[in-house]
Amino acid sequence: MSRRVKTLLIILAVLLVLAIVAVVILNHPTFGRRMSKERKARIEASLNWRDGMFQNQIPTPQFSGDKSMFRALWEFLTEGKKDRTPKEAVPAVKTDLKALPTDRDWLVWFGHSSYLFCLDGKRYLVDPVLKLEFPVTVMMRPFKGTDIYSTDDMPVIDMLIITHEHWDHLDYATLRDLKDKVKHVVCPLGVAEYLEYWGYDTKHITEMDWYEKVDNITCLPSRHFSNRMFKRNQTLWAAFLVESSGKKVYIGGDGGYDQRFKEVFEQYGCVDLALMENGQYNKDWANIHLMPDDLEKAILDLKAKQVFTVHHDKFSLAPHAWTEPDSIAHDIAERNSISLLDQPIGTVVEF
């Protein structure tokens, strides 16, 4: 056998192995499954579905600079500040969540956009990412000290709220292990396909379009996008408003600045607590994540009585210093006399 033929066979063998590995990985449950015809029909009937995908309320190019998508991604991977990750463990407190009383309103943050709050006697868990497994660990690694909570620590959850399908908000391993503790799930259109595939009972899932209200929860617009594999914007992204007999909590989800924050105030009045995205921003994707100046405008538009910022302190998904979002939030609060609830991971914050 000639050297040329041997080389060709080796190349073919390597390609075959890579193809097999790709098939195995892409068939992992974390990637979901093909959407059912019934769900697809409901999605396509949405007023927010146009030209084969969900659309934002205003035009939203994913990349806002003059660079190509590939150049922006390359710079993100190869450049940026050296202090994107902490050198020491991030401060965190281990709280017995099951022992927390339900006769008071409180919040416990787990880093990034995962948090548990109690409102009017009910426990709400938002975007829990607590138990990363392969292949997600290839893309995201939590900062040291931020992974002290597991699904075993969670109490019974009255309502699980998912804002969108991105990896840092919808985690297969976490939701798989939480299933028996969750009474009901609320999510934007299309996201329930993942949950049903992962074992959640359809009867206990409510999919919502923007401005739909079910019981005390209203699904509201955000300015973002979705893609978990290759095709973009096939599931919806959202913010949520949770109301009780005396208070309102705004769950901002992910998304760039637009008129929606003013509209929330105009339609629903002052919210008692606003959970605002603050982190993983960059000028190259300023349309789909809140930049620091936009965070300030959004908070002022909302006129929230109290603010807690999330989307930071756990993963490095943008080229800013990991401590920068906290500093920005404090500066905004000081300039505008805003009540900022800023506590370490795991701390019980009453509101």
Predicted regions and their residues:
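Catalytic core of the metallo-beta-lactamase
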Residues: 114-118, 215-270, 286, 290-294
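Metallo-beta-lactamase
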Residues: 2-134, 139, 188-253, 272-279, 327-348
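Acidic/histidine-rich helix-loop elements
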Residues: 130-147, 227-231, 282-288, 316
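Divalent metal-coordination and catalytic microenvironments
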Residues: 117, 127, 164, 171, ...
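Active-site metal-binding motif and surrounding structural segment of the metallo-beta-lactamase
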Residues: 46, 138-186, 269-275
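Active-site metal-binding loops of divalent metal-dependent hydrolases
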Residues: 128-130, 165, 222-224, 253-255, ...
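Cap/insert and terminal regions of metallo-dependent hydrolase folds
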Residues: 23-45, 49, 56, 159, ...
